[in-house]
């Protein structure tokens, strides 16, 4: 229908169009100077020394795990309440994903669950900053240091998120997403931040065929026209067309996230009169990026299932999302780990629903969602 309200919509404007035109007019549209500019600006945001732009956050996770040497027989701890790409990358490297439970009310992986899963084979811990809020990094990094295990932060939801006064990523290595529904987007893309120069060099090589330089380096840096493969790599570089859009979005991040926060505050106020349960906020000091606004739809409390609610909202022209169906309940992982039970993850996986939330959402759009929820709840 023409008046369908999507669950998310990218906030694009004249700045993004101008940025794309500049790149097209330059004659250099693949990885080049806009990538370098994006990496520098993102380091200013997070406080890291190095950033490596990639074609997606999934690509970033893949090469980050490779750069750590993750392989056959290794174990990587991650929540099941995450997008399946993390699990897929672990498996495709021959390693074993060790999925752990989350806090029932925040959906954050807990240090207690992480520590209980550590074995001599554990080679990485991947906490997820869920929905725009931060995980408890002090406790998680303390575990990593105690056991000598690297931490890779899944920050796909966390552009603009801070933990105890520092932007996510500032503690070590984190992977951000520029996917179409994220707080800033360039359609598809991602970026990895780190303070380790050797790790950053490995990422740069792995993202571009295993070469020591990319096409722009060879064109502009006076390097030999034929670079040498240092180790087999992938084609995960980000075109400058995408980087230019991401740069334009990054310049608007504060305003975009402020609008998201305002809508989230309205949702919280409205939920006081509705049976649907929002996620709880983390107890530690933080700034929430409000990537998602999630409610839990418990049939006993609400008189309707989550799936029925989503279907009903769809008939009213309102889109919703599911973030996420727990990874261990999906076919491949269900069959690979048939005895795995994660009670709080499973309870939420059956009940969570993401409501529309995006910067260009109007007051009329918001009222429409709340009116529909009241109608469905029989109020």
UniProtKB/Swiss-Prot annotation:
It catalyses: UDP-4-amino-4-deoxy-beta-L-arabinose + 2-oxoglutarate = UDP-beta-L-threo-pentopyranos-4-ulose + L-glutamate. SUPFAM superfamilies: PLP-dependent transferases. It comes from the Bacteria. The keyword Lyase does not apply. One of its GO terms (biological process) is lipopolysaccharide biosynthetic process. One of its GO terms (molecular function) is pyridoxal phosphate binding. Its cofactor is pyridoxal 5'-phosphate. InterPro entries: ArnB_NH2Trfase (IPR022850), DegT/StrS_aminotransferase (IPR000653), PyrdxlP-dep_Trfase (IPR015424), PyrdxlP-dep_Trfase_major (IPR015421), PyrdxlP-dep_Trfase_small (IPR015422). Keywords: Aminotransferase, Antibiotic resistance, Lipid A biosynthesis, Lipid biosynthesis, Lipid metabolism, Lipopolysaccharide biosynthesis, Pyridoxal phosphate, Transferase. It is an enzyme of class 2 (transferase). The modification N6-(pyridoxal phosphate)lysine is found at residue 182. Its EC number is 2.6.1.87. GO terms for cellular component: membrane. Pathway: Nucleotide-sugar biosynthesis; UDP-4-deoxy-4-formamido-beta-L-arabinose biosynthesis; UDP-4-deoxy-4-formamido-beta-L-arabinose from UDP-alpha-D-glucuronate: step 2/3; Bacterial outer membrane biogenesis; lipopolysaccharide biosynthesis. Homodimer. Catalyzes the conversion of UDP-4-keto-arabinose (UDP-Ara4O) to UDP-4-amino-4-deoxy-L-arabinose (UDP-L-Ara4N). The modified arabinose is attached to lipid A and is required for resistance to polymyxin and cationic antimicrobial peptides. PANTHER family: TRANSAMINASE, UDP-4-AMINO-4-DEOXY-L-ARABINOSE--OXOGLUTARATE AMINOTRANSFERASE. Belongs to the DegT/DnrJ/EryC1 family. ArnB subfamily. This is UDP-4-amino-4-deoxy-L-arabinose--oxoglutarate aminotransferase.
């Amino acid at each position: 229908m023409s008046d369908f309200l999507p669950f998310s919509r990218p906030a694009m404007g004249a700045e993004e169009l101008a940025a794309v035109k500049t790149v097209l007019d330059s004659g250099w549209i693949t990885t080049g100077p806009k990538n370098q500019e994006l990496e520098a600006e993102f380091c200013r945001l997070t406080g890291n020394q190095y950033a490596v732009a990639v074609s997606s956050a999934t690509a970033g996770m893949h090469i980050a795990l490779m750069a750590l040497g993750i392989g056959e027989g290794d174990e990587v701890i991650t929540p099941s309440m995450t997008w399946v790409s993390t699990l897929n990358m672990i498996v495709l490297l021959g390693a074993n994903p060790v999925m752990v439970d989350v806090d029932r009310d925040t959906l954050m992986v807990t240090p207690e669950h992480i520590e209980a899963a550590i074995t001599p084979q554990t080679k990485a811990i991947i906490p997820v900053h869920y929905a725009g809020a931060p995980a408890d990094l002090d406790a998680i990094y303390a575990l990593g240091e105690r056991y000598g295990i690297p931490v890779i932060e899944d920050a796909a939801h966390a552009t603009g998120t801070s933990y105890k006064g520092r932007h996510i990523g500032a503690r070590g290595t984190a992977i951000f997403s520029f996917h179409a529904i994220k707080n800033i987007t360039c359609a598809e893309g991602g970026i990895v931040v780190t303070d380790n120069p050797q790790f950053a060099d490995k990422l740069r090589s792995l993202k571009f065929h295993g070469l020591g330089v990319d096409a722009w380096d060879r064109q502009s840096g006076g390097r030999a026209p034929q670079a040498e493969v240092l180790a087999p790599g992938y084609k995960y570089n980000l075109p400058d067309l995408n980087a230019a859009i991401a740069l334009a979005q990054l310049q608007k991040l504060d305003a975009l996230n402020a609008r998201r926060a305002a809508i989230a505050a309205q949702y919280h106020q409205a939920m006081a009169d509705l049976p649907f349960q929002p996620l709880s906020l983390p107890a530690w000091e933080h700034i929430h990026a409000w990537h998602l606004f999630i409610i839990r739809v418990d049939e006993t409390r609400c008189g309707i299932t989550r799936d029925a609610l989503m279907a009903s909202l769809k008939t009213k022209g309102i889109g919703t999302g599911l973030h996420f169906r727990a990874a261990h309940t999906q076919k491949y992982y269900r069959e690979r780990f048939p005895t795995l039970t994660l009670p709080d993850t499973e309870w939420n996986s059956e009940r969570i629903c993401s409501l529309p939330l995006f910067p260009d959402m109007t007051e009329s759009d918001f009222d429409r969602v709340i009116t529909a929820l009241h109608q469905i709840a029989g109020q």
